[in-house]
Every structure is written in structure tokens, then in C-alpha cells.
């Protein structure tokens, strides 16, 4: 025991231990876990672990042979509860990969949580109701929460369910969303309250541990909860056994323990945030002052510095004002709203007081200033260098640290400006259209795609941010169909746009709704234009005449990028194709964006033969109900190399020194 105590005093022991455990984790993760399903099953039995509802759509997490996530559509209320044993029939499918580069990979995310299949549920039957205390408590919390005006806050704070929280995206933008995910902060508050209440009891630490373990079970053990719970237990053991291990080394022991039991946790964003912020607060604890408000600022500043690389790695953007925002919001949420939510859950007469403070929180959140900095995707070595600079702060001159950080930031911002290539992306937005043209000076987005209840442009925006772009110079809408411009408002609300270009013809309701937003934001817009310059290239809008068919009124764009000819057809049909051939002299197209998703109403053989495209791109949804692309169209394109977003994912054409390189991001 004495030798063990002595060993635990050495810092090098923990460094070696962390390196060994990390190596072991990466080795274990390199061997992909096998699913217990083969993919052909249609009948299942399992326990309902989580239910999320949106209109007629239910997302149900089920513990069967392994955890699977089911989707179920029903206009009637679904009479199932957490913990119920159910039988259900459905079709298994693999989660979708990210087919737009540098965006959220849903398949990888689920794999890291040991979920290998999704199931589209056709029918559900309850076999037996739950007898599990854990699920009975969760069901009670859900049912009682529904009685309150702000039930979403109760569910978020008490069981970690943020799915119904309408304000969550606002909190994310302000950099304070971590306050509404059950995390180490909440466990620290609860443990502090318990230890204070039981301060005269000899068993207060043991009772606190038991309570926190039970609370963690209800919240499904998120990564940050794991970290906080183990840290609390290890610190108590360190104190009781007089091991005299430093707090930093206790944290490293916690990290090693978590990695041993679940090596995939290393890819969990919540885990990385939790550990990095905890490490920063422990290392910089000596700089804390006695003044509460100074401490609040320092805590927020340190948390910001240590979590910055993780924020940029996942989001490519950071709100510099989140340091101040946290100073304002953290006390309001952690000291008032969070404890008051728990008290109101027990004593309902406190609800008016809670509603008042939630109203104050919403008002403040809507008026917080945002200063967003976009940083392109960089090699992980840049983040390693950042942390080296950060640790230098503890040992060296502060002025040198500030200078190094300034130089480092400038390098990141200058990086996109040194890329002199031209890029054309045909983005996979399902059964819709969205194309992107950009270089180091200007950006043009042609169509946004659009899908009911899904903001497909979120991936487009995130991809743009990953390239270091902070604005779209031109948003060109080929025509007013939802699958081409349905997400335009989302783009404008979440990304700076200079000008919007409409097609010829009358505005439909969707376009009128967009124009209201443009007027409100003072964004210039034009329609029925003939020519546009993007950097050194001219884009020609091939106008012919006004058609009764909205598709034929599509903006058809012809441009020459360096020496390569590109043509974007929108949803133009055979009538417009014929008129284009009659009016314009166009041939030997290098890259054709095929009209109307490969529908038989477009891509007439005479038109294709005349323009003779070398490469043809069809933007189409996988297994779409329209049967796109049509076989006749594929036959017409027989002499062209065809790329399809349903098979190839997003397609990139990169022009570098007059050479064309093609990459796909397949499923």
C-alpha cells in the first residue's frame, strides 16, 4: 500500500498511464465492432429507452439485441412509455454517412454510441408495461413536466431531454447551450447542495455519491456526467485514503478509467469539452480571486480558451462574446433557474416565479451581442500547437503568449486566401438542387435545396464555414420550387448574403415570403438578369421568353471557369432547351448540371447531342418516388461520364492551374 501511495505521487506515472491508455484505445477502436443484426430482420422485440416526438413523427431508441433507433409516423397518439417491452415490425437500414465534406457524420456518431442500424417501424405492440424503477421515475418526470408552461426546461434539466427546447438554437449561437445539457456543472451544484444539507452527517460523502449515481442513471449517463461523477468519487477516495494525489492527476485517472471502459468516448464532443474545461480550471485555479464577479469572468475566459480548439474543430466558428455572455447567463441559470426548476417541480406554486426568470433569460438571450469568427478546417497539429502555447502561459512571459496567439490566429485567417484554385461543388441535398462555386475571393450558391422539416442548408453553411468563407456574394435561385429554394430563408438567417438573384416570371408565395425577409435585412435582390461577374469569370443567364410552366422559367446559367465550360439547367424542360439552341451558340460543355433531376421532361437527345457534355451531374434523392433519373435521359447521356448525388454523394470539380480534378463524397 505504501509503495502504491508513493507511485501515485509521481507525475510521470500519470503521463505514461495516459499515453498507454490512449494507444490501447486507438488500437481497440481500429477493430470495428460487429452488429448483432445482419440487416435482413423485420421483426423485433425490445425495451423503449427514449422517445422524442415532432408533430406526427416519433423517434424511438430501443434496447433490443443492441441499441437501435426507430422512426414511426402516426397521426394518432402513440400509447407507449419509457421502459415498455414492445414488439415491432420494420425495415433496417444503415445510418447515412455525411455526403457533404466537413459536416456532421451521423453514421460515425451513432457507431461511436454503439448504434449500427436504424429501423423504419411499420407497427408497434406493447407486450408489457415497465416495472423498472429507473423508467418509472423518468415517466413520472415526463408526465409531471407536461403540466408546466415551460415543460421543455424541466425535461432538459431533470432528464437531459433537449429535443423540445425551442430556445436551444438561440443558446447555441450565444455560446451558452452547455448550461441546458445535464453536465458536470449540474452535478457539482447538486453535490454541493447535498453536502451542505448533510454537513453534520458522518456519511455525507457516501450519501452524496449514491444520490449522484441514481441521478446519473436517470439522465442516461452522458460523457460529461461520467466525468463529473467519477471525479467526485475519486476526489472523495483521495481525501479519505489520504493518497495526496494532485487534482490534475485525479482528472487524468478519471480520463484513463473512462477510456478503458469505453474507448469510443474519445470521439465524444461532450467528453472532450468536459475534460478540456476541467483541466483548464484546475491548472489556472491559482489565478482565481476572492471577488465573485472577477472569478466568474476568469472562469468563463479559461473555459473559452481551453474549449476553443474543440469548438472550431466541430463548428468552424466561435462567438467571441460568449465569454461575456457566460458571465451574464451562468449565474442566472445555475444559481436561480436550475435550482428553482427543481423546487418548482416539487412545489408547483413557485411556477410564476420560475416563468418570470425564464422570461428574463429569453429577453437577455435575444439581446446579447454576437461577434462570430469563422476559422477554416485545419490539420489537428494546429490545435496541438495551440495547447502548447496555452501551457506556455503558465511558464513564460504573458506578452509572448499573447503575441504567439495573435500570430497563430492570423495564420488561420490567412490560410483560405492563399488557395488560388476554383471549386465547383454539386451538393447532395437529397431530392433537390444546390451547387456552389467559389475561389479565394467570391462565393456563389446556386439553389439551396429544400426538404420538409429538415434544414438541408445547415450542412451547406457548415461546409462553407469549413473553407473559411464568411459570406455568400451571390445566392442564385433558378426558380421558385421548394426543392430548389425552400431553404433560402435558413441560409439568409444564418449566413451573410450580399445579393439574391431570381428568375424571370411572376413571384410565387415562397418567393414573396423570401422577399419579405430580404427587405427586412436590407439585402439587394434582382430578377431576370442576363449577365453576372464572379471574380474574372462571366456568368451568362440564357434568357429566352416567359413560359407558362414555372420549370421552363428556370435560370439557365452558362459560364467558363478558366478554360472549362459549365452549364446549370435548373428544372428547364425540352421547350426551353430548344429555344436555347435556337438563340445561343453553345457546344462542347465540360460539365452539365442535368435539368430537373434527370426527369423525362428535360435533357432531350437533340439538346444533349448539340452541347455534347463531357461530364453530367444529376442531383437526385436516393430511392425517390419520382423514378428519377429517367432511363431515357440516361440513354441520351450515354456519351457523357455521369455522376449522381444519390450514388456518389456530393461531387467536387477542382480547377487548379487549368487542370480539372474530380472528387466524390459517396455514401
Go through the PLM ranges and name each one:
Residues 3-7, 13-178, 458-465, 471, ...:
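Membrane-interface helix/helix-cap signal primarily in integral membrane proteins
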Residues 4-8, 13-17, 167-323, 378-419, ...:
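Hydrophobic alpha-helical transmembrane segments in multi-pass membrane proteins
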Residues 112-231, 236-237, 474, 539, ...:
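Aromatic-rich juxtamembrane segments at the membrane interface
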Residues 187, 223-226, 480-485, 507-510, ...:
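Active-site environment of divalent metal-dependent phosphoester hydrolases
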Residues 263-266, 366-474, 519-588, 647-667:
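Core dinuclear metal-dependent hydrolase active-site scaffold
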Residues 312-328, 332, 340-384:
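Membrane-interface amphipathic/re-entrant loop segments adjacent to transmembrane helices
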Residues 440-444, 452-503, 582-599, 612-617:
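Active-site metal-binding motif and surrounding structural segment of the metallo-beta-lactamase
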Residues 499, 579-650:
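Cap/insert and terminal regions of metallo-dependent hydrolase folds
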Amino acid at each position: 500500500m505504501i509503495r502504491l501511495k508513493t507511485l501515485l505521487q509521481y507525475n510521470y506515472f500519470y503521463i505514461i498511464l495516459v499515453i498507454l491508455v490512449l494507444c490501447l484505445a486507438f488500437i481497440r477502436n481500429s477493430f470495428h465492432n460487429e452488429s448483432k443484426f445482419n440487416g435482413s430482420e423485420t421483426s423485433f422485440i425490445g425495451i423503449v429507452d427514449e422517445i422524442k416526438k415532432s408533430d406526427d413523427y416519433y423517434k424511438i431508441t430501443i434496447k433490443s439485441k443492441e441499441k437501435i433507433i426507430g422512426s414511426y409516423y402516426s397521426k394518432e397518439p402513440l400509447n407507449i412509455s419509457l421502459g415498455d417491452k414492445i414488439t415491432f415490425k420494420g425495415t433496417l437500414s444503415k445510418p447515412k454517412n455525411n455526403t457533404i465534406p466537413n459536416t456532421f457524420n451521423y453514421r460515425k456518431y451513432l457507431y461511436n454510441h454503439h448504434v449500427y442500424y436504424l429501423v423504419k417501424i411499420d407497427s408497434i405492440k406493447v407486450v408489457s408495461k415497465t416495472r423498472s424503477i429507473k423508467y418509472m421515475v423518468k415517466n413520472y418526470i415526463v408526465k409531471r413536466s407536461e403540466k408546466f408552461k415551460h415543460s421543455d426546461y424541466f425535461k432538459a434539466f431533470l432528464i437531459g431531454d433537449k429535443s423540445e427546447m425551442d430556445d436551444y438554437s438561440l443558446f447555441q449561437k450565444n455560446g451558452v447551450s452547455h448550461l441546458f445539457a445535464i453536465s458536470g456543472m449540474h452535478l457539482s451544484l447538486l453535490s454541493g447542495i447535498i453536502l451542505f444539507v448533510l454537513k453534520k452527517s458522518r456519511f455525507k460523502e457516501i450519501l452524496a455519491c449514491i444520490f449522484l449515481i441514481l441521478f446519473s442513471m436517470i439522465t442516461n449517463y452522458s460523457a460529461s456526467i461520467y466525468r463529473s461523477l467519477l471525479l467526485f468519487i475519486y476526489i472523495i477516495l483521495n481525501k479519505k485514503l489520504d493518497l495526496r494525489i494532485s487534482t490534475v492527476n485525479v482528472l487524468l485517472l478519471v480520463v484513463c478509467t473512462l477510456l478503458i471502459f469505453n474507448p469510443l468516448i474519445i470521439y465524444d464532443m461532450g467528453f472532450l469539452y468536459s475534460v478540456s474545461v476541467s483541466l483548464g480550471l484546475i491548472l489556472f485555479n491559482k489565478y482565481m480571486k476572492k471577488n465573485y464577479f472577477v472569478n466568474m469572468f476568469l472562469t468563463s475566459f479559461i473555459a473559452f480558451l481551453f474549449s476553443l480548439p474543440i469548438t472550431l474543430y466541430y463548428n468552424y466558428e466561435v462567438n467571441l462574446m460568449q465569454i461575456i455572455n457566460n458571465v451574464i447567463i451562468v449565474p442566472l441559470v445555475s444559481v436561480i433557474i436550475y435550482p428553482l426548476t427543481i423546487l418548482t417541480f416539487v412545489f408547483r406554486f413557485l411556477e410564476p416565479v420560475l416563468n418570470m426568470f425564464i422570461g428574463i433569460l429569453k429577453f437577455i438571450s435575444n439581446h446579447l451581442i454576437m461577434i462570430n469568427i469563422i476559422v477554416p478546417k485545419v490539420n489537428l497539429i494546429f490545435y496541438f500547437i495551440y495547447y502548447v502555447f496555452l501551457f506556455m502561459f503558465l511558464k513564460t512571459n504573458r506578452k509572448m503568449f499573447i503575441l504567439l496567439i495573435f500570430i497563430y490566429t492570423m495564420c488561420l485567417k490567412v490560410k483560405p486566401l492563399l488557395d488560388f484554385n476554383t471549386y465547383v461543388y454539386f451538393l447532395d441535398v437529397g431530392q433537390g438542387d444546390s451547387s456552389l462555386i467559389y475561389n479565394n475571393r467570391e462565393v456563389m450558391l446556386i439553389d439551396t435545396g429544400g426538404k420538409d422539416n429538415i434544414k438541408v442548408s445547415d450542412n451547406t453553411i457548415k461546409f462553407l464555414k469549413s473553407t473559411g468563407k464568411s459570406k455568400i456574394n451571390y445566392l442564385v435561385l433558378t426558380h421558385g420550387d421548394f426543392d430548389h429554394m425552400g431553404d433560402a430563408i435558413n441560409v439568409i438567417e444564418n449566413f451573410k448574403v450580399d445579393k439574391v438573384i431570381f428568375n424571370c416570371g411572376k413571384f410565387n408565395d415562397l418567393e414573396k415570403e423570401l422577399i419579405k425577409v430580404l427587405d427586412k435585412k436590407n439585402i439587394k435582390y434582382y430578377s431576370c438578369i442576363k449577365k453576372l461577374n464572379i471574380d474574372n469569370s462571366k456568368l451568362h443567364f440564357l434568357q429566352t421568353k416567359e413560359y407558362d410552366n414555372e420549370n421552363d422559367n428556370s435560370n439557365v446559367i452558362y459560364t467558363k471557369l478558366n478554360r472549362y465550360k459549365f452549364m446549370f439547367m435548373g428544372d428547364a424542360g425540352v421547350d426551353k432547351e430548344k429555344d436555347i439552341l435556337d438563340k445561343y451558340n453553345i457546344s462542347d460543355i465540360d460539365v452539365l448540371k442535368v435539368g430537373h433531376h434527370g426527369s423525362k421532361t428535360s435533357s432531350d437527345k437533340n439538346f444533349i447531342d448539340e452541347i455534347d457534355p463531357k461530364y453530367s451531374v444529376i442531383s437526385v434523392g436516393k430511392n425517390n418516388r419520382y423514378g428519377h433519373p429517367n432511363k431515357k435521359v440516361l440513354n441520351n447521356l450515354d456519351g457523357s461520364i455521369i455522376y449522381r448525388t444519390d450514388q456518389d454523394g456530393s461531387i467536387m470539380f477542382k480547377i487548379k492551374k487549368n487542370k480539372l480534378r474530380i472528387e466524390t463524397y459517396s455514401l
